[in-house]
Amino acid sequence: MKEGIHPEYREVVFMDVQTGNKFITRSTIHTRETVEMDGKTYPLFKCDVTSESHPFYTGAQTRIVETGRVEKFRARFARTAGTVKSAS
């Protein structure tokens, strides 16, 4: 492999902005901010959404149930089912 073409792969702290939760993982991301954690200084990346705050993972997700095509058809024509147009 060629030297000097690969980005630096290092430990980075990702912080969830909504919850304030921080976790360390490895990444090639470049940041200007740093944070001290466990006695070491790490680059800090602030995330808007992580598994700590996303509604799908927290169980706070509300499911929108859409009625199907058949139900929409039945609801629309249920009103007119009792009335019959005269053929005059």
Swiss-Prot record:
GO MF annotation: an example: structural constituent of ribosome
Cellular component annotations (GO), alphabetically ordered: ribonucleoprotein complex; ribosome
GO terms, biological process: translation
Keyword Ribosomal protein: yes
Keyword match Zinc: no
Record's keyword terms, sorted: Ribonucleoprotein, Ribosomal protein
Cystine pairings recorded for this chain: none
PANTHER family for the chain: 50S RIBOSOMAL PROTEIN L31, CHLOROPLASTIC (PTHR33280), LARGE RIBOSOMAL SUBUNIT PROTEIN BL31C (PTHR33280:SF1)
Subunit note: Part of the 50S ribosomal subunit.
Family according to the record: Belongs to the bacterial ribosomal protein bL31 family. Type B subfamily.
Identification of the protein by name: Large ribosomal subunit protein bL31B
Organism in which the protein naturally occurs: Bordetella parapertussis (strain 12822 / ATCC BAA-587 / NCTC 13253)
